[in-house]
């Protein structure tokens, strides 16, 4: 594996771990003070949206699993690894781009969510 692919894989791993953390915040800790503060909502808003957040959290977990499995396959030389990792980080970046353009008040979160997947995409394609 080339140095660029290795650094891209590391960025993909970090993006995957970030999405595992997002899963935790959305699916497990949604009504906690930390989650309410992070997502800028009241406890009542969190309680009213916990089913939606639970579902969205699992979406983020599946993106993380897809990406992390892809990187594992890459490191073991399986040809399916790189495309799987690329598709995972492409999905992560696409979601971040959608958030960036559809919700101007959430652009900071979109940049945080999309930077590592974008770095991984660029380096994995080189």
Place the predicted regions along the sequence by residue.
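Cytosolic, membrane-interface loops and tails of multi-pass inner-membrane proteins
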Residues: 27-49
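Core segments of transmembrane alpha-helices
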Residues: 57-69, 113-117
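Physicochemical signature of membrane-embedded alpha-helices that form the seven-helix bundle of GPCRs
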Residues: 7, 11-14, 59-62, 84-87, ...
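N-terminal signal-anchor transmembrane alpha helix
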Residues: 7-28
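Interfacial helix-start motif at the membrane-water boundary
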Residues: 45-62
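Small-residue-rich segments of transmembrane alpha-helices in multi-pass membrane proteins
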Residues: 114-126
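Helix-coil boundary and interhelical linker segments in multi-pass alpha-helical membrane proteins
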Residues: 1-10, 69-83, 123-126
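Transmembrane helix-loop-helix
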Residues: 69-115
């Amino acid at each position: 594996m080339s140095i660029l692919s290795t650094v891209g894989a590391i960025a993909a791993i970090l993006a995957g771990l970030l999405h595992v953390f997002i899963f935790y915040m959305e699916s497990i800790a949604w009504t906690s003070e930390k989650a309410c503060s992070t997502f800028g909502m009241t406890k009542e808003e969190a309680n009213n949206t916990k089913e939606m957040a639970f579902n969205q959290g699992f979406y983020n977990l599946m993106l993380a699993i897809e990406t992390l499995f892809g990187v594992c396959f890459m490191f073991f030389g399986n040809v399916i690894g790189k495309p799987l990792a690329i598709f995972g980080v492409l999905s992560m970046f696409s979601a971040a781009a959608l958030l960036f353009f559809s919700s101007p008040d959430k652009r900071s979160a979109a940049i945080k969510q999309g930077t590592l997947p974008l770095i991984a995409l660029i380096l994995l394609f080189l």
